[in-house]
Amino acid sequence: MKKLVVGLAVMLGFCMCAHQPSGTLDVNKALDYCAEQTQRTLAELKTDSGIDYTMMPRNIMADEQHWNCRKATKEEWCAGFWPGVLWYDYEYTQDKHIKEEAEKFTNSLEFLSKIPAFDHDLGFLVFCSYGNGYRLTKNPAYKQVILDTADTLATLFNPVVGTILSWPREVEPRNWPHNTIMDNMINLEMLFWAAKNGGNPYLYDVAVAHADKTMKCHFRPDYTSYHVAVYDTITGNLIKGVTHQGYADSTMWARGQAWAIYGYTVVYRETKDPKYLDFAQKVTDVYLERLPEDKVPYWDFDDPGIPDAPRDASAAAVVASALLELSTYLPNGKDAAIEMLSSLSSRHYQSGKSKPSFLLHSVGHWPNHSEIDASIIYADYYYIEALLRLKRLREGQTVQG
């Protein structure tokens, strides 16, 4: 009985925050909160010997109060998000100390521009950090790191298949000759940027080819996405679509669909080809149609444990950010994004004083029992990105800054 009462209370709380009028979100208050939490994290990272700028905040488990940090290595795909958070916080606060910290953490990732590609995550690692750093400072050294890393990422492109290989390490163990995951759509932005900022024009062609093949093979007829598409390297044909982090091969994993929404919005921005805008709308529609009332998805839309399954705040943050950009191309999406941000900015999803992260209730890798109902750094990154995008739109600026 006690569990039932608690469960009803939580569900009621989720419903209440969904009814906030979309125009009432105080974006400056939410950004002030992010600034406070960023300062808390920096204070936590500081030891008697100073800050180790190679150690990046990754997650805080539900029963913990402090960040678990991981070394910035080629294997740590999340290492670029904390520097990105700092750059976004600097953009809002104009705090020179935050800028200095952003520079130091960002510099820890320079090595990625000088080594062969470990996997496709170079966009997450370098464009979230160096990309934002260059946008705000125009430091030419940052630009060169981005250009060099984009060239490295392109070495994973297979012209027979037409996509970038996501996980070379999984080719033999899983018998996935050429595997491409939906997350890879996010890395295309770095290729587009490099191609128009002095890099090899071929990078544009790689990004477009990847987007086209993914659009053709990575989605079911209802526009829900597989997490992984496995291709034949001889024929280039699709072998199968499977999951890796979702509930099952046939289900809609929330963050995977979020990557698709964000990714195709970017592809339309960079190409202005209406087929990508149409596709972005379609993959968005199937996501929005199945959301719970507070607009924060269950980690997988088809988990049979719903409504008791965990939510994924990270997916909501990614989609909110994407929808704010998409709303500048289509006459809808902004209100839904504000509803998502209103929920994420409520006491049910913000960490508040309990932890130095921005958000609670994200899911990393359910099948591996990893980062379940946790605070995760990429949720914070896309949350502050979305808040800044909303602030810019309200102030009559371009959504990207």
Sequence positions of predicted segments:
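Glycan-recognition and catalytic cores of secretory/periplasmic carbohydrate-active enzymes
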Residues: Q20-G401
